[in-house]
Amino acid sequence: MNLSRKNCFPFAGIAGVILLNALNLFAAGPKPDGGSGPVQAWVGARVIDGTGKPAIENATLIIRNGRIEAVGRRVKIPAGAERIDATGKTIIPGLICAHGHLSDAAQFGVYLRDGITTILSLGGAKEFDLRDQSAKATPGTAPHVYVAGLIQDSTAIPGAVAVKTPDEARKSVDDLIRNKPDLVKVRVDDFLGARPKMAPDVYQAVIDEAHKNGFRTAAHVVLLDDAKGLLRAGVDYIAHSVRDRDVDDEFIALMKKRHVFYSPTLTRELAVFTYAETPSFFSDPFFLKEADPAEMARMEDPKYQEKMRNDAGAKWYKDHLPIAMRNLKALSDAGIVIAMGTDSGGGPGRFQGYFEHLELEYETKAGLTPMQALVSATGGAAKALNISNQVGTLEKGKQADFVVLSANPLDDIKNTRSIEQVWIGGVRVPAK
């Protein structure tokens, strides 16, 4: 697995450390190829390869030993290959959630059946165990899992550890990296004045200590000024939208200078306020096939809905969602790599699997084209996770992670929900 660090650390002084610690990065990696059956030839499909290039019409996709051997319109089908007629179907790469949260192995199947074959779980107490379980799982039953472990925070809330001084921050990062996280996450947020916010010298220490040991960093952030401070401190990944103000030229320049990735998590905001009433997607058959009835009941409880109607925080996030959407469009237009993320599983009503598809819908509502939205959940997300040499696009040599759709998502992004089959590493994901 190529663990190139290109554009991650433009600081020559730590180049040797990065080289020595490269194997720490994304240590789990995609699981070994599971497909060992006959060579497959998927014939006649429309292939959207995840690079942003135009769709390949009437394409042939060759799968051998769990990897892509060839894809294109003029592809020779190997002798003895299993020929699969995919006429009228659209094949896309397996989707990548570049910001979600796992808390139980039972959630693996939910993500997979909804076409999410890779997930970055950005903060939680059980994440290292879940990464191990995913790596050891029967082929076709678990996504590729990447994790951050405990979040470096100002307050010890669930899934986080409190660090209040630079020395505490350095020690906490040193403790964390013994488990080889795929990213070190820092949270800079006072939750609309509800608790203290991490000071700049503390998050600087988190980022520096992670970088010194060869680990990249991601940030939970809300406000533009905090996001700029984190960028100046060297953060590698902005894992939420800037929501208080429109981003400016300075912010965009800081993002470009260090090739920082951006995950909008628009549905995170939606989940904060949408349950003031029963949302329309509660009647969507695609949602209902995987939704947890108990969680639905909690969101439909009249007392909970009344609480959401009267919650000042919910109102703030609802009022500021349009800003987040404008910022996504501005950053995409500026050439920043967008990585689809949702914060699914990170709070009440953030339904895993479905919210990834809803996020794509909201990305297009923000002004992205369906192709741009798809790339954010495939090739773009793979770049953000530093795994684009393995997954994210349907190209020769990549893992055979793909989704077969009955309708074209370039016509309507909601067609990503028209899932007929999901494959990971050349193995078909079983139905529920």
Model-identified regions with their sequence ranges:
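Active-site neighborhoods of metal-dependent hydrolases
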Residues: 172-194, 243-366
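Histidine-rich, glycine-flanked metal-binding segment
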Residues: 29-38, 47, 51-92
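Acidic, glycine-enriched loop/beta-strand segments at the rims
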Residues: 30-32, 47-60, 73, 322, ...
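Bacterial N-terminal signal peptides
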Residues: 12-24
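Active-site gating/metal-coordination segments in enzymes
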Residues: 150, 156-208, 232, 236-237, ...
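Short, acidic/polar
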Residues: 103-110, 162-176, 221-228
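Divalent metal-dependent hydrolysis catalytic cores, especially in the metallo-beta-lactamase
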Residues: 109-131, 142-152, 181-191, 216, ...
